[in-house]
C-alpha cells in the first residue's frame, strides 16, 4: 500500500520554521504531555500511550488500555502533576468492545511505564460524540477536564429542568471541586495563561460560531441557548444556573473551523509572542495567533473587520493565521525547551516550531528504525483510521447521530 502524502506545514513568519519532529503514530494521536524531556502521547484508536524519548518514538507503549473509539471516543486526554499521570478515555472490556464508561484514571510514572491504575472519576456513558477530552494542570497543580454535552440536555445545558450530570462542564478532577464552568457544547482545548493563571478554552459550535473563551471560575458558556456573540433575546432565555455568569466569547468564527488545542508561549525563543495565544483547528489545518490585550482578558486586532471579535463569513483571516497545512491538529504545547509542539491527528505526526536562528544547532530528525516500523504498521490500518478521522472531524462541528 502506498503511504499517504501530506502537504508540509507552512508558517507566515519567516523567522520560524516547522520541523517534523516525530512521525509514525499509527492510530490517531490526540494529545500529549511533557515529563521532563520525555513526551507521553495518546493514540485514540488503540488505547496506547506512546513514549517519545530523545526525539525517538519508542516501539513499546508505556500503557495499553482497552478502549472503544467509535465516534469521538477513545484515548482522549492527559495531564501530569509530578509523577502522577491523569488519563481520560472511553473504557471497554476489550479493544473495540462496547463502551463501559468514560473514565479518568491516575497512574504513577516510573520513567518506563504507567503503573498503579486508580479510578478518579466515572462519567456518564451515553452517546459517542461530544465527549470533550482536553485536560490541563493549572499553576496551583489542580487538574481540570472539559466534557461536552454528550447529547444530553438539562440544567447544565441551560435548560430549566434536568439534573446536573457532569456534562457540558469543566470539571476540577484533582482535588475534586464544584463545576468550574458550564454550558459548553463540546471542546477539545484547554490552556492556562502562565501570567494570570486563568483558564481558556475552545468550543465547537453547531452550524456556526465556534469560540475561544476566557473560562474563569463559575463561567456559563451559554449552550444550548447561545453560541457566538449573544443578543438580547438569547440572554433573556438563559435560565440563570445559580452562581454562574455568562459572557460573550473572546473570539468567534461564524463559519465553523473546529478549533481544538490552544496554548500560550512564555519563552525566550518566542520572545515576540509572549503576549499571544496560539490556537489550532481540525477542519482547515490552520494555526492561529491572537494578540492579547494589556489585561490579558481579550484580544486586539489591527483589521477593523475583526474589532467585533468575530470572523464573519467572507472576512479575511490573514491577520490571525500564523501557519497552515497541519491537518486535523488536536494539541499544541510549549515544550521544556521553550519551543512549540503540535500533534496532528490526521498526519500521525508531532511537529515542532523553532526559530530559524536555532536550526543550525543539533536538532534530531527522527527517521529511526522504530519509527519506520511504526509506519509499516500504520499502512496496514490507514483505511480504517482515515474513516474514523473523518467522523471525528465532522462530529466536532455538528451532531451526527451514530449509525
Could you tell me what each predicted segment is?
Residues 11-12, 73-75, 149-320, 327, ...:
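Beta-propeller domain segments
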Residues 24-27, 182, 324:
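Short, conserved clusters of charged catalytic residues that mark active-site
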Residues 11, 19, 171, 392-397:
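Short, intrinsically disordered low-complexity segments
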Residues 1-6, 87, 151, 181, ...:
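Short intrinsically disordered, low-complexity coil segments enriched in acidic
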Residues 113, 146, 155, 159, ...:
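Intrinsic disorder/low-complexity signature
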Residues 6-149, 189-192, 197-205, 255-297, ...:
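Acidic, Gly/Ser/Thr-rich repeat motifs that build Ca2+-stabilized beta-propeller blades
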Residues 1-8, 359-403:
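Secretory targeting signatures
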Amino acid at each position: 500500500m502506498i503511504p499517504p502524502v501530506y502537504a508540509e506545514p507552512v508558517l507566515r513568519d519567516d523567522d520560524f520554521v516547522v520541523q517534523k519532529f516525530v512521525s509514525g503514530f499509527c492510530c490517531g494521536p490526540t494529545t500529549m504531555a511533557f515529563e521532563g524531556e520525555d513526551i507521553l502521547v495518546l493514540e485514540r484508536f488503540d488505547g496506547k500511550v506512546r513514549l517519545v524519548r530523545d526525539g525517538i518514538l519508542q516501539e513499546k507503549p508505556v500503557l495499553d488500555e482497552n478502549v472503544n473509539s467509535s465516534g469521538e471516543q477513545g484515548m482522549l486526554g492527559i495531564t501530569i502533576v509530578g509523577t502522577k499521570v491523569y488519563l481520560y478515555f472511553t473504557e471497554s472490556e476489550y479493544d473495540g468492545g462496547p463502551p463501559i464508561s468514560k473514565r479518568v484514571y491516575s497512574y504513577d510514572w516510573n520513567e518506563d511505564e504507567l503503573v498503579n491504575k486508580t479510578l478518579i472519576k466515572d462519567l456518564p456513558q451515553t452517546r459517542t460524540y461530544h465527549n470533550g477530552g482536553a485536560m490541563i494542570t493549572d499553576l496551583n497543580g489542580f487538574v481540570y477536564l472539559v466534557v461536552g454535552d454528550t447529547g444530553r440536555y438539562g440544567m447544565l445545558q441551560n435548560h430549566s429542568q434536568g439534573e446536573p450530570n457532569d456534562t457540558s462542564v469543566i470539571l476540577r478532577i484533582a482535588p475534586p471541586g464544584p463545576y468550574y464552568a458550564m454550558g459548553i457544547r463540546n471542546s477539545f482545548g484547554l490552556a492556562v495563561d502562565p501570567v494570570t493563571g486563568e483558564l481558556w478554552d475552545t468550543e465547537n459550535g453547531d452550524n456556526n460560531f465556534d469560540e475561544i473563551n476566557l473560562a474563569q471560575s463559575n463561567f456559563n458558556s451559554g449552550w444550548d441557548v447561545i453560541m457566538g456573540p449573544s443578543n438580547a433575546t438569547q440572554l433573556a432565555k438563559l435560565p440563570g444556573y445559580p452562581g454562574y455568569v455568562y459572557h460573550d466569547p473572546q473570539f468567534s468564527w461564524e463559519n465553523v473551523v473546529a478549533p481544538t488545542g490552544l496554548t500560550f508561549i512564555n519563552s525566550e525563543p518566542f520572545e515576540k509572542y509572549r503576549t499571544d495565544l496560539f490556537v489550532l483547528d481540525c477542519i482547515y489545518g490552520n494555526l492561529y495567533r491572537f494578540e492579547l490585550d494589556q489585561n490579558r482578558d481579550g484580544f486586539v486586532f489591527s483589521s477593523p473587520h475583526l474589532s467585533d471579535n468575530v470572523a464573519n463569513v467572507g472576512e479575511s483571516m490573514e491577520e490571525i493565521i500564523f501557519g497552515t497545512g497541519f491537518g486535523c491538529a488536536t494539541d499544541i504545547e510549549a515544550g521544556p525547551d521553550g519551543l512549540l509542539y503540535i500533534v496532528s491527528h490526521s498526519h500521525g505526526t508531532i511537529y515542532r516550531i523553532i526559530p530559524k536562528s536555532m536550526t543550525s544547532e543539533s536538532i534530531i530528525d527522527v527517521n529511526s528504525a522504530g519509527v519506520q516500523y511504526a509506519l509499516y504498521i500504520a499502512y496496514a490500518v490507514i483505511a480504517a483510521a482515515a474513516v474514523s478521522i473523518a467522523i471525528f472531524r465532522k462530529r466536532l462541528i455538528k451532531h451526527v447521530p451514530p449509525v
